[in-house]
């Protein structure tokens, strides 16, 4: 099992923008030094607590500061961007990273982002599908382009000059394009079936109960079979909120205490998702009353925290429910205490993973 990381990120809105950007960059640089396989970075335009507004710009700032870690958008929210712009920008960063880029995509889940871009009342899933189809066509078809759609028409026919290169979008470094990765939230996700049919690979969200995470595998398997791909657990990434400490007292205080980053994270996530009518994501049973979905319940059921041996045991128990998967994605959280947060990443990479892979 490989180790990767993902961060939305999610920080207290009171913290300075410059400070949290530096902290998030330091987290990826540390992950690279510790041998993490990948780092996925989220993006949100209209959220002060989730302040990275462009995952591609953020990742570009890390190209010369990292050596081996693959850097992924987590995700580019396609309805909020013009497909031609994303095709060109992704091709550029893929060439700059020379094969270390992963193209994470989604329809976007932040409603205020959809609102500011004028997409609140549109079918954003339909926009997402049209956008990625346009992007793949731009990369694979010769110029001049003449792509028609419901939301975007893309052409360079009027101003195409082959001799000078005008009207031609650059293509990615990886052939035929960077690996496409999708985040999966909904239990028994039909969207995952469609993604797997196209050869895309999933990351299951870190704020889902284990039984809902487990529901993703049969959907991925079904999609792979329908698309003619091998359904291999090694291609399934599962995100999890984990805190590893040198002693149990510190683990519990930082991992579940009111002053810790995990408490802040899940308080924010619960408010957003429950406010958007999605309390079921936090329930282990859909018949569970909404009133039982408390913050303490969510922390106890979704955060893995403890000493090395305890965390290993908890991850094994988690896998007993989900089944095997290829990559454990360590969810990044605010560094309330930088030393404890860094130590957790070190223990995760140097002690927890070797024991899990024995």
Regions found by a protein language model. Name each.
Residues 7-22, 76-84, 177-187, 243, ...:
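Active-site mouth loops of central-metabolism enzymes
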Residues 32, 59-67, 90, 94-101, ...:
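Acidic (Asp/Glu)-rich catalytic clusters
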Residues 82-198, 214-218, 226-227:
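Internal, glycine-rich beta/alpha segment that forms the wall or movable "lid"
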Residues 3, 35, 43, 62, ...:
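Conserved, mostly hydrophobic/aromatic
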Residues 38-62, 77, 109, 207-210, ...:
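Glycine-rich, proline-tolerant flexible connector loops at the mouths of alpha/beta enzymes
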Residues 125-169, 211-322:
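An alpha-helical appendage that flanks or caps ligand/catalytic pockets
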Residues 1-71, 177-178:
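N-terminal beta1-alpha1-beta2 module of alpha/beta enzyme domains
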Residues 3-5, 39-41, 71-74, 101-105, ...:
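Hydrophobic faces of well-ordered beta-strands that scaffold small-molecule active sites
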């Amino acid at each position: 099992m490989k180790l990767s990381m993902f961060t939305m990120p999610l920080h207290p809105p009171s913290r300075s923008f410059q400070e949290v950007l530096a902290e998030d960059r330091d987290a990826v640089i540390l992950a690279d030094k510790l041998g993490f396989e990948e780092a996925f970075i989220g993006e949100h335009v209209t959220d002060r607590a989730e302040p990275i507004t462009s995952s591609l710009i953020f990742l570009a700032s890390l190209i010369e500061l990292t050596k081996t870690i693959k850097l992924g958008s987590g995700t580019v929210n396609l309805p909020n961007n013009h497909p031609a712009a994303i095709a060109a920008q992704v091709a550029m960063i893929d060439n700059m990273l020379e094969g270390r880029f992963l193209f994470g995509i989604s329809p976007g889940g932040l409603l205020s982002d959809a609102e500011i871009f004028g997409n609140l009342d549109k079918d954003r899933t339909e926009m997402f599908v049209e956008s990625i189809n346009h992007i793949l066509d731009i990369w694979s078809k010769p110029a001049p382009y003449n792509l028609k759609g419901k939301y975007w028409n893309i052409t360079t026919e009027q101003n195409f000059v082959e001799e000078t290169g005008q009207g031609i979008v650059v293509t990615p470094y990886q052939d035929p394009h960077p690996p496409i990765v999708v985040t999966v939230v909904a239990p028994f996700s039909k969207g995952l079936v469609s993604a797997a049919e196209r050869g895309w690979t999933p990351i299951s969200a870190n704020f889902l109960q284990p039984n809902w995470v487990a529901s993703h595998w049969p959907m991925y398997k079904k999609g792979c079979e329908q698309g003619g791909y091998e359904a291999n657990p090694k291609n399934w990434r599962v995100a999890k909120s984990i805190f590893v400490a040198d002693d149990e007292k510190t683990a519990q205080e930082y991992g579940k205490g009111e002053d810790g980053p995990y408490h802040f994270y899940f308080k924010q996530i619960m408010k957003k998702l429950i406010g958007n009518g999605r309390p079921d994501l936090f329930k282990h049973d859909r018949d569970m009353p909404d009133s039982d979905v408390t913050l303490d319940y969510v922390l106890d059921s979704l955060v893995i925290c403890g000493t090395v041996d305890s965390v290993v045991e908890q991850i094994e128990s988690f896998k007993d429910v989900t089944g095997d998967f290829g990559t454990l994605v360590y969810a990044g959280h605010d560094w309330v205490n930088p030393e404890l947060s860094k130590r957790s990443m070190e223990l995760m990479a140097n002690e927890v993973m070797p024991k899990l892979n024995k």
